[in-house]
């Protein structure tokens, strides 16, 4: 009864008003799995390729009708009749059908939509919550959220070089209390911005996007917001920064426009280290460009014992690249973005490889999101311990937090909130 009898794709709209793809997978039993695919703004060069139409007369060339056609035609024909519970085999079939190194022929967006929809259908067929279907009986850890409070870089129309300034409520007793903490700090930050006559418009991921004179101003204001909301900076609420440094790395230097600086790798690492000394920063993402492996080595040697160093662009959720990084002792964490690699199986493999190497895995959204909540189930199903899914505003972000709250309720007394133990690779 779990045989696939129909696959249907359509073009829908993401949180930035751009087209993306959604797929339905129908099983013989009548069960339906539906999944939609996110899209990034800061896209690494190593990511699997999403297929866009290039027709400037529709959506400025960003349409996905070709990807939809590939699902409704070639992909549908290939997986019709297959058992939806055989996720690894189906994903392998999709990869081989595409035949390219980076899924550029059929489109990683087309392949991923089907891969995720298959898993959802199989979970429904098995009468299991999706997180339980993915992870089994030991799936009980609620992840610590990285909550975006201030947007910059390509995620906002302001002068900040850094892409995200986040809070990490690692000292709270439960996911529910962590979400409450995030909402309260977010509200307090709004008040502080109003007092400074700064705008409270939000960026792609729901964080505020004010025009600060320097990058560091964001950190000082976040610490103030944490304190005035009634929480302890550091012990209860830490800070994370996504530099997205590949975006301002040119000609071998890091160009910080808002600060008027042009820094070598060593100088930029000193710059970040000075922040770590002054503020309760526990996580830095893409602190060095994906092109600067030597710089990554220096950063890891300098801060890797006390700060989580998350590789996003450099690893691209790709086990081949992650293995290279592990062998060279680069970073100590990987950001997991399902659309960077293009199938559920490869996503789960990347999480497993990271854990086996003592790296942490942070399951992440993209700046262009949909109402799909599957990353919440992946985070719990794999016991990934950390999730990054935006601010406490915009329904496309809150959908994931609300799904985590439902999962916590479903787990009942078995549920455990990861808290500070989520950063197991760091020395106390």
From Swiss-Prot:
Keywords: Cytoplasm, Glycolysis, Lyase, Magnesium, Metal-binding, Secreted. The active site is at 205 (proton donor), 337 (proton acceptor). Catalyzes the reversible conversion of 2-phosphoglycerate (2-PG) into phosphoenolpyruvate (PEP). It is essential for the degradation of carbohydrates via glycolysis. SMART domains: Enolase_C, Enolase_N. It is found in: Cytoplasm; Secreted; Cell surface. GO terms for biological process: glycolytic process. It comes from Nitrosomonas eutropha (strain DSM 101675 / C91 / Nm57). The keyword Cytoplasm applies. InterPro entries: Enolase (IPR000941), Enolase-like_C_sf (IPR036849), Enolase-like_N (IPR029017), Enolase_C (IPR020810), Enolase_CS (IPR020809), Enolase_N (IPR020811). Binds a second Mg(2+) ion via substrate during catalysis. (2R)-2-phosphoglycerate binds at residues 163, 337, 366-367, 388. This is Enolase.
């Amino acid at each position: 009864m779990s045989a696939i009898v129909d696959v249907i794709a359509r073009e829908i709209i993401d949180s930035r008003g751009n087209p993306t793809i959604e797929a339905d997978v129908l099983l013989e039993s009548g069960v339906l799995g539906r999944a939609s695919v996110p899209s990034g703004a800061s896209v690494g060069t190593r990511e699997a390729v999403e297929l866009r139409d290039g027709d400037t007369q529709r959506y400025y060339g960003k349409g996905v009708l070709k990807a939809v056609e590939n699902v409704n035609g070639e992909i549908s024909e290939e997986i019709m009749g297959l058992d939806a519970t055989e996720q690894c085999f189906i994903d392998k079939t999709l990869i081989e059908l595409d035949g390219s190194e980076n899924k550029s022929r059929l489109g990683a967006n087309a392949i991923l939509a089907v891969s995720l929809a298959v898993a959802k259908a199989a979970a429904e067929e098995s009468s299991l919550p999706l997180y339980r279907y993915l992870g089994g009986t030991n799936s009980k850890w609620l992840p610590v959220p990285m909550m975006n409070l201030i947007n910059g870089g390509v995620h906002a129309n302001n002068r900040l070089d850094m892409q995200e300034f986040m809070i990490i409520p690692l000292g709270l007793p439960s996911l529910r209390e962590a979400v409450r903490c995030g909402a309260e700090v977010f509200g307090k930050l709004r008040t502080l911005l109003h007092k400074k006559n700064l705008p409270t418009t939000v960026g792609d991921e729901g964080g505020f996007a004010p025009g600060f004179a320097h990058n560091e101003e964001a950190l000082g204001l976040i610490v103030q917001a944490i304190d005035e909301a009634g929480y302890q900076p550091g012990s209860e609420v830490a800070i994370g920064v996504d530099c997205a440094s590949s975006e301002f790395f040119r000609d071998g230097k890091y160009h910080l426009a808002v600060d008027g600086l042009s820094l070598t790798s060593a100088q930029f690492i000193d710059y970040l280290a000075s922040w770590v000394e002054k503020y309760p920063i526990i996580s830095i993402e893409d602190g060095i460009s994906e092109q600067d492996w030597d710089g990554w080595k220096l950063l890891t040697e300098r801060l890797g014992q006390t700060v989580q160093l998350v590789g996003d662009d450099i690893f691209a959720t790709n086990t081949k690249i992650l293995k290279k990084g592990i062998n060279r002792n680069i970073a100590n964490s990987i950001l997991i973005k399902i659309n960077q690699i293009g199938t559920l199986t490869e996503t789960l493999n990347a999480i497993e490889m990271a854990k086996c190497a003592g790296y942490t895995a942070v399951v992440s959204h993209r700046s262009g999101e949909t109402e799909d909540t599957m990353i919440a189930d992946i985070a719990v199903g794999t016991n990934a311990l950390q999730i990054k899914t935006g601010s406490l505003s915009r329904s496309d972000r809150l959908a994931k937090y609300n799904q985590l709250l439902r999962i916590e309720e479903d787990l009942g007394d078995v549920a455990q909130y990861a808290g500070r133990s989520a950063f197991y690779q760091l020395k106390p």
